[in-house]
């Protein structure tokens, strides 16, 4: 409980400091928000975890990516640099933690964990495009795998991040949450990337869909745009309804992963198809479908 109180207080203080120092996420052609917002939520969560979870290995492995995200917030780093550093952290984790990597029980080479980790951390970053979405997804995910301090740290930040957000997570926050929950999920599922993927099913769906969508229209798959699921949904039905719907889908994916039933992958595919169909209906509108 103290984590929530401290996180709330830190967010308040850091928000004031960010405004005075002009450390703000300003609107531009790549972003959907219409005003400058302090991107210090990740910093407040990090400092809270530093107090309560400094010996937690998942937190320790997340520190380099938190710093990477903070530098990205400050200097807008190249995606190549971010991919390289994320891959190095994945290699570090895979060599430091003695678990056998598998997919639904079938053992695989550890290099697949590196690929999976890089993709998942970037998936969390992609999902952080709607007020409260990544925070809500991460809150339920952390609760379900017993990461209590992380959950309470998010709870303290969440009131600042709900629509219309007064404070953003920033890339420092999305990278921190992505690294922490990816590593924690893999260990929770004893190295099984299949069940970890089901558990973190919404970020995984969004990164795969975004990648394929851009390739179909012959665009750089790493280039940002405003055609993600949360962007299209929020433009048509509003931020709050979108937030409730997508967090609910993420919660269902969490439960599918926790079940550890192989055949639940079919339910996952069905739910993804529902998301995709709804996306196409909303995106089509009165004209042609635009990916």
Swiss-Prot record:
Cysteines engaged in disulfide bonds, as pairs: none
EC number from the UniProt entry: 2.7.8.33
Cofactor dependency: Mg(2+); Mn(2+)
Subcellular location per the Swiss-Prot or TrEMBL entry: Cell membrane
Reaction(s) this enzyme catalyzes, per UniProt: di-trans,octa-cis-undecaprenyl phosphate + UDP-N-acetyl-alpha-D-glucosamine = N-acetyl-alpha-D-glucosaminyl-di-trans,octa-cis-undecaprenyl diphosphate + UMP
Pfam families cross-referenced by the UniProt entry: Glycos_transf_4
Membrane-protein topology: Multi-pass membrane protein
Site (described: Important in orienting the substrate): 72-73
Temperature-dependence annotation: Optimum temperature is 65 degrees Celsius. At 30 degrees Celsius activity is only 7% of the optimal value and at 80 degrees Celsius, the enzyme is totally inactive.
Residues annotated as transmembrane: 4-24, 32-52, 57-77, 84-104, 110-130, 138-160, 167-189, 194-216, 237-257, 262-282
Activity regulation as described: Partially inhibited by magnesium at concentration higher than 10 mM and totally inhibited at concentration higher than 250 mM. Also inhibited by tunicamycin, NaCl and KCl.
Transferase listed as a keyword: yes
Enzyme class, UniProt record, top EC level: transferase
Site feature Could be required for catalysis, where: 128, 131
Keywords: Cell membrane, Glycosyltransferase, Magnesium, Manganese, Membrane, Transferase, Transmembrane, Transmembrane helix
Cross-referenced InterPro entries: Glycosyl_transferase_4
Entry GO CC: Gram-negative-bacterium-type cell wall; plasma membrane
One of the GO BP terms on file: cell wall organization
Biological or metabolic pathway of the protein: Cell wall biogenesis; cell wall polysaccharide biosynthesis
GO molecular function terms noted in the UniProt entry: glycosyltransferase activity; magnesium ion binding; manganese ion binding; phosphotransferase activity, for other substituted phosphate groups; UDP-N-acetylglucosamine-undecaprenyl-phosphate N-acetylglucosaminephosphotransferase activity
pH dependence per the entry: Optimum pH is 8.
Primary localisation category: membrane
Function: Catalyzes the transfer of the GlcNAc-1-phosphate moiety from UDP-GlcNAc onto the carrier lipid undecaprenyl phosphate (C55-P), yielding GlcNAc-pyrophosphoryl-undecaprenyl (GlcNAc-PP-C55), the lipid intermediate involved in the synthesis of various bacterial cell envelope components. The enzyme is highly active when tested with C35-P, instead of its natural C55-P lipid substrate, suggesting that at least a 35-carbon chain is required for the lipid to be a substrate of WecA.
Similarity comment: family membership: Belongs to the glycosyltransferase 4 family. WecA subfamily.
Name by which UniProt lists this protein: Undecaprenyl-phosphate alpha-N-acetylglucosaminyl 1-phosphate transferase
Gene source species: Thermotoga maritima (strain ATCC 43589 / DSM 3109 / JCM 10099 / NBRC 100826 / MSB8)
Lineage of producing organism: Bacteria, Thermotogati, Thermotogota, Thermotogae, Thermotogales
């Amino acid at each position: 409980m103290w984590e929530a109180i401290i996180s709330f207080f830190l967010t308040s203080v850091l928000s004031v400091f960010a405004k005075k120092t002009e450390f703000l996420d300003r609107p531009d052609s790549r972003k959907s928000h219409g005003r400058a917002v302090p991107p210090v939520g990740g910093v407040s969560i990090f400092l809270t975890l530093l107090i309560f979870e400094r010996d937690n290995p998942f937190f320790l492995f997340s520190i380099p990516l938190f710093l990477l995200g903070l530098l990205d917030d400050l200097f807008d780093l190249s995606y190549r640099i971010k991919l390289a550093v994320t891959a190095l952290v994945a290699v570090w984790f895979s060599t430091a933690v003695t678990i056998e990597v598998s997919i639904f029980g079938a053992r695989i080479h550890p290099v697949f964990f590196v690929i999976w980790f890089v993709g998942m951390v970037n998936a969390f970053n992609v999902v952080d495009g709607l007020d409260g979405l990544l925070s809500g997804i991460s809150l339920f995910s952390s609760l379900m795998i017993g990461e209590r301090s992380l959950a309470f740290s998010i709870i303290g930040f969440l009131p600042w991040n709900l629509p219309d957000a007064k404070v953003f997570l920033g890339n420092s926050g999305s990278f921190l949450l992505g690294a922490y929950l990816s590593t924690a999920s893999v260990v929770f599922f004893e190295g099984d990337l299949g069940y970890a993927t089901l558990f973190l099913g919404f970020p995984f769906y969004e990164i795969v869909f975004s990648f394929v969508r851009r390739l179909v229209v012959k665009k750089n798959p790493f280039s940002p745009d405003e055609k993600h699921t949360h962007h299209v949904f929020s433009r048509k039905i509003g931020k709050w309804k979108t937030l409730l719907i997508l967090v609910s889908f993420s919660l269902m994916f969490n439960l599918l992963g926790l079940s550890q039933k192989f055949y639940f992958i079919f339910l996952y595919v069905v739910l993804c198809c529902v998301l995709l169909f709804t996306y196409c209906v909303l995106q089509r509108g009165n004209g042609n479908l635009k990916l």
